[in-house]
């Protein structure tokens, strides 16, 4: 005689968990307090597409250490930060560096999605996208929208 355990969530919750996809609203729950300005759902998708194009041209900088090094060297681009990175101290100095150097930056909801867009199996908390003529139109569109976002106080 064996006991049959009832599934507390039901079959629809189990099917949702198997899909692996989380909605934008679910991702916003895990945001840290400094994640401002936060990209909209539409802008987030555009940024992911731009990042994928930049990866093909090898025009991205990935990770806190690499991004910080090239920002200090004067490299230009859009900085995309993951809003669910903890502890905050890992990358809280990067927005200040961007503001000092007039670089546009934006937060997106998920570090796992950011890493996946960059072609990595690992989560990535910060990526800098550099301009390139192959995807200049998509880059300019993202740059315009990121610059129009209000900066935090």
From Swiss-Prot:
Keyword terms of this UniProt record: Disease variant, Dyskeratosis congenita, Isopeptide bond, Nucleus, Phosphoprotein, Ribonucleoprotein, Ribosome biogenesis, RNA-binding, rRNA processing, Ubl conjugation
Crosslink site: Glycyl lysine isopeptide (Lys-Gly) (interchain with G-Cter in SUMO): 5
Tissue spec: Expressed in brain, colon, heart, kidney, ovary, pancreas, placenta, prostate, skeletal muscle, small intestine, spleen, testis and thymus. Also expressed at lower levels in the liver.
Residues the record lists as Phosphoserine modifications: 19
Keyword rRNA processing appears in the UniProt entry: yes
Pfam families membership: Ribosomal_L7Ae
Keyword RNA-binding listed: yes
Intracellular or extracellular location(s): Nucleus, Nucleolus; Nucleus, Cajal body
CC per GO annotation: box H/ACA scaRNP complex; box H/ACA snoRNP complex; box H/ACA telomerase RNP complex; chromosome, telomeric region; nucleoplasm; sno(s)RNA-containing ribonucleoprotein complex; telomerase holoenzyme complex
GO biological process per UniProt: rRNA pseudouridine synthesis; snoRNA guided rRNA pseudouridine synthesis; snRNA pseudouridine synthesis; telomerase RNA localization to Cajal body; telomere maintenance via telomerase
Subunit structure: Part of the H/ACA small nucleolar ribonucleoprotein (H/ACA snoRNP) complex, which contains NHP2/NOLA2, GAR1/NOLA1, NOP10/NOLA3, and DKC1/NOLA4, which is presumed to be the catalytic subunit. The complex contains a stable core formed by binding of one or two NOP10-DKC1 heterodimers to NHP2; GAR1 subsequently binds to this core via DKC1. The complex binds a box H/ACA small nucleolar RNA (snoRNA), which may target the specific site of modification within the RNA substrate. During assembly, the complex contains NAF1 instead of GAR1/NOLA1.
Family: Belongs to the eukaryotic ribosomal protein eL8 family.
Protein name per the record: H/ACA ribonucleoprotein complex subunit 2
Biological source species: Homo sapiens (Human)
């Amino acid at each position: 005689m064996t006991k049959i355990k009832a599934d507390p969530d039901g079959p629809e919750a189990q099917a949702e968990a198997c899909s692996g996809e989380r909605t934008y609203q679910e991702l916003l729950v895990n945001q840290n307090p400094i994640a401002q300005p936060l990209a909209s759902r539409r802008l987030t998708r555009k940024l992911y597409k731009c990042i994928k194009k930049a990866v093909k041209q090898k025009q991205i900088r990935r990770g806190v250490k690499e991004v910080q090094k090239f920002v200090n060297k004067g490299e230009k681009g859009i900085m995309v930060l993951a809003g669910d990175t903890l502890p905050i101290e890992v990358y809280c100095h990067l927005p200040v560096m961007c503001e000092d150097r007039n670089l546009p930056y934006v937060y997106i909801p998920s570090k796992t999605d950011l890493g996946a867009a960059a072609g990595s199996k690992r989560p990535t908390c910060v990526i800098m996208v550099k301009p390139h003529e192959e995807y200049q139109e998509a880059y300019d569109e993202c740059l315009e929208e990121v610059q129009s976002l209000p900066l935090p106080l």
